Amino acid sequence: MANTLEQLKSYTTIVADTGDIEAIKRYQPEDATTNPSLILKAAQIPEYRALIDNAIAWAKLQSADIEQQIDDASDKLAVNIGVEILKLVPGRISTEVDARLSFDKEKSIAKAHKLVRLYQEAGVDKSRILIKLASTWEGICAAKELEQEGINCNLTLLFSFAQARACAEAGVYLISPFVGRILDWYKNDTGKDYDAVNDPGVVSVTEIYNYYKQHGYNTVVMGASFRNIGEIIELAGCDRLTIGPSLLEELANSQVAIQPKLLPASTTVAAGEPLTEAQFRWDFNQDPMAVDKLAEGIRNFAIDQGKLEVMLKAKLAN
């Protein structure tokens, strides 16, 4: 019998949630996703030294201003890592817009344009890139404009149905609902343990998936942020699942037989009127878990972006 990972690949597109090229070679995913935390982690890998050196040298040629150099080096490093990953995956790379821009639509769009330009200068067409944006109202509005320009987006830090609905109504290419972080919040809040079937993160993604399919939305649902393989197995059949190296290894070493749990609707019905900004903000605010986890996620990505910039600043000074 095929291992659990190989079985899963027959129902769901598997995406590697890592910037580690060796892990990507090992598990042969379709796509890969990165974020500021993963770029920071990848920057510590000795094999990536040349990519960092290249980003530093390039940034120095763009500007004499140190703050601009840091910004340029950070963007160039993320793209350099993405370019290397794209040599190994047949699909797409997700590269994230600076989390500190999560509440600024125009600056998010400008950063997305810059990342796409850097990829194109490296010979990568925009059809192989997903721009990652936080699922704030401003991020969703930025994604709507980018999608209309033909730049596909991955809306991340998604914890609520309101966020998912707004993304679909904006015509976003893909969303990343965070399964494990939802579970973390509920375990902390209730003190209870949850089996995979009743896992609040699994329940949330299942609801979103079913809503999208019932209403004929094309937005791809990519479950993310897993805590155990039970969550992953319960979401077999989801459009995509992005999984970190340790859980990919556990799936590859497992012989559990799996069946698809999520299935597309046989018929579709028209959706209602799109959410207004006021409705979105109210519905989102009614979910304390989502409010907490979105804010925390943005803060933590911003912290790791800051750590990366400290490292780059030291290298730029040499």
Swiss-Prot record:
Recorded catalytic activity of this chain's protein: D-sedoheptulose 7-phosphate + D-glyceraldehyde 3-phosphate = D-erythrose 4-phosphate + beta-D-fructose 6-phosphate
Predominant location: cytoplasm
Entry's EC annotation: 2.2.1.2
Main EC class the enzyme belongs to: transferase
Compartment(s) where it occurs, according to its Swiss-Prot or TrEMBL record: Cytoplasm
InterPro entries cross-referenced by the UniProt entry: Aldolase_TIM (IPR013785), TAL/FSA (IPR001585), Transaldolase_1 (IPR004730), Transaldolase_AS (IPR018225)
Family to which this protein belongs: Belongs to the transaldolase family. Type 1 subfamily.
Protein name (Swiss-Prot/TrEMBL): Transaldolase
Species for this entry: Shewanella sp. (strain ANA-3)
Lineage: Bacteria, Pseudomonadati, Pseudomonadota, Gammaproteobacteria, Alteromonadales
